[in-house]
Amino acid sequence: TQNSWELKFYALKPFYRSLANWAIFMTNPATYGWKDNVGTMPPIKVHIHDVPLTHEQRLAAQTATGNLITVSMGGIGDRGKLSQIAKGKDGMPTNKPGYIRDLIASWPSESTLVWCKYNQEQETMESVLEGCASIHGTTPEEARYALIDDFKQQRRMQLVTKPKILGYGLNLQVATRQVFSGICDSFELYHQAVKRSNRVGSTRELNVHIPVTELETPFIDNVLRKADRVQQDTEAQESMFKEIGYDFVG
């Protein structure tokens, strides 16, 4: 492919055979007969929720794309426009914040991470989730520590932020629910955000809720398709290394 490498099917085994001389691909030691430290990790359950568009959103989408219905994501510019319309850009009426508020209210005793994409979207979620913690890119470091501690100690039951801000490294197992108010095409951002609450040592299943309008369906379909592909590739690569069976398997 243009400006990138492509691994042909017939070259898979020779490639991994060469790689296995000095490397190993591993997500679970049990694959190679070693102690399984991750087998007891609870499952991640993903729930997709359909949120109806408002009349104003539908008209705005038709104006932006020239189509009566959304049939594809289009280019980056079109995707960005549709994503902002779906989230109620510039005060446009939207059903999503109220839907998310009511959804979270249905599990009052569970801590929830709410992931946003845009600043305005995050501010809207702050306004409908009374008493929530909210961390922006401009939030001072000391304030971040205090808000995260409030969330971990369940003094605040919801934490609103963005994957680019808190999606990496943090251990937030206290959250047994996650809600993606906004989502983009990046599987890495989605995966890292989800794994903040599903880590070695977790004892409770994680429920991930993704409320989407028809404008956002292509985004989530794309991300989940990437997730399936990553899982398939992971299993195939581990199987290949195991089949090759150099000394590291012994």
List each language-model region with its residue ranges.
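A conserved SF2-helicase RecA2
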Residues: 185-250
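Hydrophobic residues at beta-strand termini and immediately following loops
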Residues: 49-51, 135-137, 181, 211
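Conserved helicase ATPase core of P-loop NTP-dependent helicases/translocases
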Residues: 113-115, 123-126, 130-166
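Conserved beta-strand segments of the P-loop GTPase G domain that flank and frequently precede/overlap
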Residues: 115, 161-162, 180-183, 211-212
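Alpha-helical elements of the RecA-like P-loop NTPase motor core of helicases
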Residues: 59, 98, 123, 127, ...
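Short, well-ordered beta-strand core segments
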Residues: 159, 178-179, 197
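Interdomain linker/hinge connecting the two RecA-like lobes of the SF2 helicase core
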Residues: 1-111, 116-119, 125, 221, ...
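A short beta-strand element within the Helicase C-terminal
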Residues: 170-183, 207-209
